[in-house]
């Protein structure tokens, strides 16, 4: 028969489990506005029962808290990253297409290619055809031709500026990708260090997922996490995981605590 203190111990385990649940709930409420925070839940199970060799069998031994885990769906994370990559791509295209639209704007009255071209080929040419010897018509035609030349030169300058802006944007994005990759690799090492002890590094995992969210705005990402098996026992997981991030059709960006930096290389040919 268990002692009277055994009942007190059962109550004590209940207090500990309830305290863990209350602390987790408080943490969830406190971080309701925290970007990237994942709601956490407490996993509990009944403690191993005590055999008391009585007719009723075993006596319950209370409750124990197994873990505090994030509530996160990897499937929806993957779908979000896929859609986020498309959103980032089209946002960037829209931004530069709107710039190009301003350069090609044509109101048909005073500005734009059609207006300038019509002045040359309709107004100027018709006047010259009517009176080929007219100095005024010739001068007017040359003036319209000069205006069209200036339009093309100005357009070329504007397009070159857009091209330089895009190249600079690419360089900045590459630097941002490298920065994120370095942070993810560092977090991978920190997470494994903690989780090797059997504790879930929930906050660090949230930070890592938030970085992948940012990365997915720039480039397509594929994330895979697999448990690391004990080298001496293939049936035992160590608690650590191999976290891999691939981009651009399967190129490895981050593999555990290592990452491969990207580099911008100028194109030498336009063929």
Feature locations, PLM:
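Amphipathic, non-membrane alpha-helical segments that mediate helix-helix packing
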Residues: 4, 8-33, 82-104, 110-128, ...
């Amino acid at each position: 028969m268990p002692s009277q203190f055994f009942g007190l111990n059962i109550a004590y385990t209940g207090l500990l489990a309830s305290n863990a649940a209350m602390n987790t709930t408080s943490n969830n409420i406190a971080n309701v506005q925290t970007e990237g925070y994942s709601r956490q839940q407490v996993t509990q199970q009944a403690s191993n029962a005590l055999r008391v060799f009585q007719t009723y069998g075993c006596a319950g031994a209370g409750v124990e808290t197994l873990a505090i885990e994030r509530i996160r769906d990897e499937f929806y994370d993957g779908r979000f990253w896929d859609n986020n990559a498309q959103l980032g791509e089209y946002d960037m295209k829209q931004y530069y297409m709107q710039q190009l639209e301003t350069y090609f704007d044509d109101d048909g009255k005073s500005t734009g290619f059609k207006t300038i071209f019509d002045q040359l080929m309709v107004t100027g040419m018709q006047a010259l055809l009517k009176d080929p010897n007219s100095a005024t018509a010739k001068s007017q035609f040359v003036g319209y031709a000069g205006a069209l030349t200036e339009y093309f030169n100005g357009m070329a300058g504007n397009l070159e500026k857009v091209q330089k802006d895009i190249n600079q944007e690419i360089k900045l994005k590459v630097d941002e990708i490298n920065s994120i990759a370095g942070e993810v690799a560092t977090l991978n090492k920190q997470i494994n260090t903690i989780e090797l002890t059997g504790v879930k590094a929930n906050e660090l995992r949230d930070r890592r997922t938030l970085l992948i969210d940012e990365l997915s705005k720039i480039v397509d990402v594929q994330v895979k996490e697999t448990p690391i098996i004990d080298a001496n026992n293939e049936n035992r997981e160590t608690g650590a995981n191999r976290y891999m991030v691939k981009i651009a059709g399967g190129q490895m960006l981050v593999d555990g605590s290592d990452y491969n930096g990207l580099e911008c290389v100028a194109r030498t040919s336009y063929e």
